[in-house]
Regions:
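Solvent-exposed loop and beta-edge segments used for protein-protein assembly and interaction
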Residues: 43-46, 77-79, 114-116, 132, ...
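N-terminal segment immediately downstream of the Sec signal-peptide cleavage site
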Residues: 37-82, 161-170
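C-terminal partner/receptor-binding element of secreted or periplasmic proteins
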Residues: 144-170
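Predominantly extracellular/secreted and cell-surface proteins with exposed
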Residues: 64-129
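Secretory targeting signatures
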Residues: 1-38
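Short, flexible beta-strand-to-coil junctions
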Residues: 53-58, 88-92, 152-154
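Generic recognition of long tandem-repeat/solenoid scaffolds
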Residues: 45, 50, 85, 120-122, ...
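Extracytosolic low-complexity repeat regions of secreted or lipid-anchored proteins
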Residues: 121-128, 133-154
Length: 170
């Protein structure tokens, strides 16, 4: 009789240990997934691609340039994100078409996250008519659906009329 009681107690203990372990495992999984979500900037993702579709206007609201092109950003959640982009520009009548390449983005400081948008301040290289402009101050605002890239107008002769170039995330 003592043998049967020991076996029954051991069996109950095993069930208790298994149930307790399962509960600990589930709680630990929830804690880990919650902390991972906050680290990766609100689930923005580490790589994004998209297209530009921006209309530049003058101070009166008249369309001066139509901007289009492709962009790609990787390493978003790292200390050295990479931006590659081509911005094609043309007058509203289709004339004066040209393009700019953007690369060599270097992050300055830490990203700032507001309202599920990550803001990255840094510098990049942008090709212009007279050659590449290096260390061009660049601000990127990236969300799940949209990207805005702003270049300091001083070094590029106000080429983008002091406006961000906007696009969408594919």
């Amino acid at each position: 009789m003592d043998l049967d009681q020991n076996f029954t107690l051991t069996r109950l203990e095993r069930r208790f240990i298994l149930s307790f372990s399962l509960i600990i495992f589930l709680v630990a999984g929830m804690v880990i997934s919650t902390s991972t979500a906050s680290v990766s900037y609100g689930q923005i993702g580490d790589t994004k691609v998209g297209v530009f579709n921006h209309t530049q206007t003058d101070s009166s609201g008249n369309t001066t340039w139509i901007n289009s092109g492709n962009w790609s950003m990787s390493g978003i959640n790292s200390s050295s994100p990479s931006l590659t982009a081509i911005i094609e520009m043309a007058k509203p009548n289709g004339s004066a078409g040209h393009e700019h390449e953007i690369n060599n983005f270097k992050l300055i400081g830490s990203p700032v996250v507001e309202n599920q948008t990550i803001h990255l301040n840094g510098t990049s290289t942008i090709t212009m008519r007279n050659g590449p402009v290096t260390s061009e101050p660049t601000v990127i605002a990236l969300s799940q659906e949209k990207i805005d890239i702003y270049f300091d107008p001083e070094n590029i002769n106000n080429h983008f009329e002091n406006q961000s170039i906007s696009g969408i995330v594919n």
